[in-house]
């Protein structure tokens, strides 16, 4: 569904949030994006397909409305699930689309290969049988890529070290998930801080500069200390640090906070409680431009996990270099 961004107002971190939308049984809120109704929207699914619609073709509903099934707007299969929404306008500056799968396969493809997509869709990336598309980002061709896993590790490398492939190619190994799965894809174009949030509601900002540059395919460095108390890492985003953050739970609760309220900690720390989930878990996080004239209140009594308890391991021990196995298919069209 579509709704105006001023529907949700800033609250203090650690709050309980408000009801964002009614949900069907076994459904969760996955993504919020900010765009103009006149922009095109590329819709990528877990099966590796891409569809295109206009922003104004998505009906506008109230805050608590369920919206309509995406299958009513695009010709996706009933077994497909939306994994990424990429808005773009005629004057966009993006040159490439960067893909990462749940198992850590990556691909970089020129943006113009996806500009002539209709509502019936086309193949965006080939996938292994046990894999699915996880994230897609638009880039300028010279970005730094950051990929994070559910185990709290992250890898950072230069985008231009990955050669461009055709629309239907499979890709190359980008991140060693080490028994977990990919939970985040970000670029340095989005900000100089890394925001991490765990499923039990702990969050923090860390300086992007704290993440050592490695090569694609590495296991990476610790980006958050994952424990039973914190739960798995569910969000990793690059931010400026002054945006608003919309946090959504599996139970349909939404809270909007200012990232000015989230302190900067070392990359191996766990952070502070940013949402009280109780018997719920965080399902997804969206970043929005800050509300004008929103009041930021310092709350010192919120639970903080002392970063001193979670010392960083030395970089030489923290990083395991990649193997060079590629899994590239031919670029022939399907």
List where the protein language model places each region.
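C-terminal interaction appendages of subunits in large macromolecular complexes
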Residues: 1-334
């Amino acid at each position: 569904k579509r709704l105006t961004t001023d529907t949700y107002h800033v609250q203090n971190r650690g709050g309980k949030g408000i009801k964002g939308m009614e949900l069907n049984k076994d459904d969760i809120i996955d993504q919020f994006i900010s765009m103009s109704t006149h922009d095109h929207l590329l819709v990528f699914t877990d099966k590796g397909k891409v569809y295109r619609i206009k922003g104004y073709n998505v009906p506008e509903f109230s805050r608590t409305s369920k919206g309509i099934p995406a299958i009513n707007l695009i010709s996706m299969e009933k077994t497909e699930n939306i994994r990424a929404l990429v808005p773009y306008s005629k004057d966009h500056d993006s040159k490439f689309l960067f893909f990462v799968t749940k198992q850590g396969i990556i691909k970089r493809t020129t943006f113009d290969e996806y500009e002539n997509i209709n509502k019936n869709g086309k193949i965006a990336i080939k996938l292994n049988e046990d894999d699915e598309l996880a994230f897609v980002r638009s880039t300028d061709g010279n970005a730094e890529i950051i990929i994070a896993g559910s185990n709290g590790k992250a890898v950072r490398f230069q985008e231009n070290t990955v050669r461009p492939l055709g629309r239907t190619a499979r890709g190359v190994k980008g991140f060693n998930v080490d028994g977990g799965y990919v939970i985040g894809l970000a670029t340095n174009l989005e900000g100089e801080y890394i925001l991490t949030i765990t499923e039990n509601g702990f969050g923090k900002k860390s300086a992007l500069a704290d993440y050592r540059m490695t090569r694609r395919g590495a296991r990476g460095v610790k980006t958050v200390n994952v424990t039973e108390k914190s739960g798995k890492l569910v969000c990793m985003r690059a931010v400026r640090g002054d945006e608003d953050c919309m946090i959504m739970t599996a139970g349909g609760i939404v809270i909007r906070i200012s990232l000015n309220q989230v302190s900067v900690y070392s990359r191996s720390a766990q952070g502070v409680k940013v949402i009280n989930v109780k018997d719920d878990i965080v399902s997804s996080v969206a970043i929005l431009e800050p509300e004008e004239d929103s009041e930021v209140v310092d709350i010192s009594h919120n639970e903080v996990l002392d970063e001193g308890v979670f010392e960083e391991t030395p970089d030489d021990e923290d990083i395991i270099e990649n193997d060079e196995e590629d899994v590239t298919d031919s670029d022939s069209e399907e």
